[in-house]
A protein has these predicted regions:
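A short, N-terminal "cap"/entry segment at the start of jelly-roll beta-barrel domains
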Residues: 2-69, 151-205, 289-305
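Conserved short histidine dyad/triad with adjacent acidic residue
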Residues: 55-60, 74-89, 209-223
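Ligand-binding loop in jelly-roll beta-barrel domains
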Residues: 68, 123-150, 238, 250, ...
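Residue-level marker of beta-strand positions
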Residues: 83, 118-120, 126, 218, ...
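A generic "binding-loop/recognition-motif" signal
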Residues: 90-91, 109, 125-126, 225, ...
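Glycine- and acidic-residue-biased ligand/ion/polar-headgroup-sensing regions
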Residues: 92-93, 97-102, 226-228, 232-237, ...
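Extended, hydrophobic interaction surfaces within ordered domains
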Residues: 94, 102-106, 110-164
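Short acidic-glycine-tyrosine-enriched beta hairpin
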Residues: 108-122, 243-258
Length: 305
């Protein structure tokens, strides 16, 4: 499918899409000679996989279904007191807290995480996530180093070692990155970033972090050598991909394939923030001419730009 309007006509350059006007929940939105396609995954169109007597809702955004290679992303919503029982994966996972307070158990080691704190769980390490708030909802962003997300339940109990708001020791396989101001850097004017998981934090095949954009802030037009997922967790973002414009908010997620020029802007009067994830172990961006993002120049491909 190449469009979301009447008659399934291709979307014209410069069209701003608001999700209240979109009829198809998950559309492949471009058709070009390079066969490179972005997707916009709207929050209101996601269907939850329910766990634990409807206490935990798991939503998948980016995955093999939209063309992603080597990674997947989504969110999990926990009702008050709910938990996702011990499980493990055969790949890296990163869990970032978006709302609420989490209690994360890693083979008995217990950590408490607040907003934008992140836990990286290596392959094969059993872990459990709980909403320790008896009244409020817990919302987490998850990222897996596979395009086909799956969880293997672990029927085992571990002795408790409560670390509170502490961090793992050098002997522990997991990593906790706290959202602390001294680690935040200004990637572009008024755009402040914090790397939450990457190879240097133990992750294999994925990296990502949090980005906060003040009004009128933006990133320059750029490309990556790997696929990217961008989830807008606060405010409203404008996403430009080769002249196509998409408006995202409320955890709407953009999937940007490898080598496709794109940029994000905050054109609102309020702050905007995102969780970004790359299908690579360390972040890397290649700046290209802004006219490739605006659509004024035709993208020749990464090898020719």
């Amino acid at each position: 499918m190449t469009g979301t309007g009447a008659g399934n006509k291709p979307l014209s350059h410069g069209l701003i899409i608001r999700w209240s006007d979109v009829f198809e929940p998950e559309s492949i939105l471009i058709e070009d000679p390079f066969a490179v396609r972005e997707s916009i995954l709207a929050t209101r169109s996601r269907e939850a996989v329910v766990s634990g007597l409807r206490q935990v809702e798991l939503y998948t955004y980016v995955s093999k279904a939209c063309g992603a290679t080597g990674f997947s992303t989504g969110i999990a919503k926990f009702k008050p007191g709910a938990h996702l029982p011990y499980h493990a994966h055969k790949f890296s996972e990163a869990v970032t807290i978006l709302e609420g307070r989490a209690r994360v158990l890693v083979e008995g080691r217990v950590y408490r995480l607040g907003q934008y704190d992140c836990a990286h769980l290596p392959s094969g390490v059993a872990h459990q996530v709980e909403n320790e708030d008896p009244e409020g909802e817990l919302v987490c962003h998850w990222a897996f180093a596979t395009s086909t997300p799956v969880r293997e339940l672990i029927d085992r109990q571990f002795p408790i070692d409560d670390r509170g708001f502490g961090n793992p020791t050098s002997a522990d396989p997991e990593t906790i990155v706290r959202y602390e101001s001294d680690a935040i850097y200004e990637l572009s004017k008024d755009a402040f970033f914090l790397d939450l998981f990457a190879r240097r934090f133990g992750a294999v095949g994925i990296c990502g972090g949090h980005g906060r954009f003040l009004p009128d802030a933006s990133l320059p037009c750029h490309i990556h050598d790997f696929d990217e997922s961008i989830t807008i967790i606060k405010g409203t973002a404008m996403c430009l991909v080769q002249g196509r414009r998409y408006e995202l908010s409320d955890c709407d997620t953009a999937f940007i394939p490898k080598g496709l020029p794109h940029r994000f802007l905050n054109l609102s009067d309020d702050e905007m923030s995102m969780v970004w994830v790359y299908a690579g172990s360390e972040p890397d961006r290649r700046i290209v001419d802004a006219h490739y993002c605006s659509g004024e120049l035709t993208w020749p491909g990464a090898d020719l730009a």
